[in-house]
Regions:
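Acidic/glycine-rich beta-solenoid
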Residues: 1-119, 136, 154-162
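A cytosolic small-molecule/anion-sensing beta-strand core signal
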Residues: 30, 49, 125, 185-187
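Flexible loop/turn segments at secondary-structure boundaries
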Residues: 44, 54, 63, 130, ...
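Short helix/strand-bridging catalytic loops that position acidic/His residues to coordinate divalent metals
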Residues: 54-55, 165-166, 194-199
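Short beta-strand segments enriched in hydrophobic/aromatic residues
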Residues: 78-81, 133, 167, 197, ...
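A motif-centric feature for acidic-aromatic and gly/ser/thr-rich catalytic loops and repeats
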Residues: 107, 115-180, 215
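Short turn/helix-capping motifs enriched in Asx and small/polar residues
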Residues: 136-150, 172, 180-182, 186-234
């Protein structure tokens, strides 16, 4: 039976796509790390000793490579897609692209270092970056999220920090958020690797996002979920 519903993602959004329609579309290693996602055309994912991805390889030969510090902090990402190579270096709160300073991250936004201009996030109660405005108040980007972080519509796409303020990588249809301790697939509502703090959450899936309760909780870093507190002034 085929679902006759129209697409649920519009204007820059993303959604789950059953790209191959096979019985086994996902493969995991003995540590529980995702090593293959046929729906995204990912043929292999290799990992380091911290169960962080070293290399993502697509069926057409495109790759995404990661470099980390000893504590697991991401230092570099190299996208090789077709004939184009893009290198992103992370030096504290300064982001370089192909060796050129690009962004200076701040608590409430970022500075584009090519022109020294400030850009500000307008966030919702979950810390999701819903709107980006420049220092004149002009809207540069707007994002509309499903509860689990999928984007059903967006405009602008001027910067990568979106749901929960996490870095989103949509290149080559990867569509993953980097939570630090592990990657998150919002189209599935699941992380790609086992929770390193699994012994604290024995009553839920090791891959579930914030205990399957994205309305009342957020995940801070792939290790720890937190309740959302909303106060009303009487």
């Amino acid at each position: 039976m085929d679902d006759a519903a129209a697409a649920s993602a519009y204007n820059g959004g993303f959604e789950f796509k059953d790209g191959v329609k096979q019985a086994n579309e996902y493969t995991y290693d003995s540590n529980g790390n995702l090593t293959k996602d046929l729906n995204k055309g990912i043929s292999t994912i290799t990992y380091n000793v911290l169960n962080l991805p070293n290399m993502v390889t697509f069926s057409d030969g495109s790759t995404i490579a990661y470099t980390y510090g000893a504590d697991g902090t991401k230092l570099k990402t190299v996208h090789k897609i077709g004939s184009t190579t893009t290198t992103t270096d992370y030096c504290g709160n300064v982001i370089y692209e192909n060796g050129v300073q690009k962004l200076l991250l701040t608590e409430e936004g970022y500075v584009t270092l090519s022109d020294g201009k400030y850009h500000y996030y307008l966030k919702d109660h979950q810390g999701n970056n819903r709107v980006v405005i420049n220092q004149s108040g002009t809207v540069e980007e707007a994002n509309h999220y499903y509860p689990f972080g999928g984007v059903f519509a967006s405009s602008g796409n001027v910067q990568p920090y979106k749901y929960n303020g996490k870095e989103y990588d949509g290149k080559k249809g990867l569509n993953l958020y980097d939570y630090g301790a592990r990657m998150y697939d919002a189209a599935l509502g699941r992380f790609t690797t086992v929770d390193p703090s699994a012994e604290n959450y024995f009553n839920t899936s090791l891959y579930a996002y914030c205990g399957n309760n994205p309305i009342n909780r957020i995940d801070l870093d792939g290790l720890l979920l937190a309740r959302i507190l909303i106060y009303k002034v009487l």
